[in-house]
């Protein structure tokens, strides 16, 4: 599993100037936590983080600092601001009710992996994380996270990831190969069975249609079906 760098903080709800949210950007530095502002009594903290690239999430290490519950949602930096994120890790307990009320055992480390993630988001490529930390039982103490470490399910970040554009290009190439073979076979068949009719057919027009550049898979499929129909008519 390859570690994924958190490139920057997109937004946050609250921070203590002495323990800012930027402390989460480097989990391997001498650890200083991210804590909410001492005057913030809402009992909830939120932060949105940008990853260096979109990757499938293998596991997430979380160092706790007084947070009772944690939820992790994922999304894409290209999404509009009003589009809701998808839940990767549902609200999960980091402290017991008793410890949270008494302020005991505030520190701890949890590893969340594939079996903890929800199916709609697990295994997909994401480059945004949105963390929601909450401590509803007592609000007189600051809380937050000690560190956050994200790892991809890829063995290396140099591994190729097939995205939509690469997949589309592959499909288009396959369709073009099919059309070339189809025309070669069809013209030979027509030459054997309908040689008198070939005199009245403009083969250049047909070949032009076969070689025409297309931009979407749907257009390719439409042209292929139309050309096959033309062969049946002839």
Curated annotation (Swiss-Prot):
InterPro entries hit by this protein: Galactose-bd-like_sf, Xrcc1_N
SUPFAM superfamilies assigned to the protein according to its UniProt record, in alphabetical order: Galactose-binding domain-like (SSF49785)
Annotated GO biological process: single strand break repair
Cellular component per GO, a single term: nucleolus
Gene3D superfamilies the record matches: Galactose-binding domain-like
Bilayer-crossing regions: none
MF GO annotations: damaged DNA binding
PANTHER family for the chain: DNA-REPAIR PROTEIN XRCC1 (PTHR11370), DNA-REPAIR PROTEIN XRCC1 N-TERMINAL DOMAIN-CONTAINING PROTEIN (PTHR11370:SF4)
Name of the protein: Protein XNDC1N
Gene name per UniProt: XNDC1N
């Amino acid at each position: 599993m390859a570690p994924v760098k958190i490139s920057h903080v997109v937004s946050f709800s609250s921070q203590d100037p002495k323990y800012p949210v930027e402390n989460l950007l480097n989990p391997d530095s001498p650890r200083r936590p991210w804590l909410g502002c001492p005057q913030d009594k809402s009992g909830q903290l939120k932060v949105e983080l940008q990853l260096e690239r979109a990757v499938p999430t293998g596991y997430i290490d979380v160092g706790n600092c007084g947070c009772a519950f944690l939820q992790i949602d994922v999304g894409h930096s290209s999404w509009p601001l009003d589009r809701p994120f998808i839940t990767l890790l549902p609200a999960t307990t980091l402290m017991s009710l008793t410890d949270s009320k008494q302020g005991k055992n505030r520190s701890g480390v949890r590893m969340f992996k594939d079996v903890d993630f929800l199916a709609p988001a697990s295994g997909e490529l994401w480059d945004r994380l949105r963390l929601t930390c909450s401590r509803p039982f007592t609000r007189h103490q600051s809380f937050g996270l000690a560190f956050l470490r994200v790892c991809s399910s890829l063995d290396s970040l140099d591994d190729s990831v097939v995205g939509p554009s690469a997949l589309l290009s592959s499909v288009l190439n396959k369709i073009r190969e099919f059309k070339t073979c189809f025309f070669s076979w069809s013209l030979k068949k027509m030459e054997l069975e309908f040689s008198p009719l070939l005199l009245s057919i403009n083969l250049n027009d047909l070949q032009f249609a076969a070689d025409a550049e297309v931009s979407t898979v749907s257009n390719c499929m439409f042209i292929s079906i139309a050309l096959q129909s033309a062969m049946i008519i002839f």
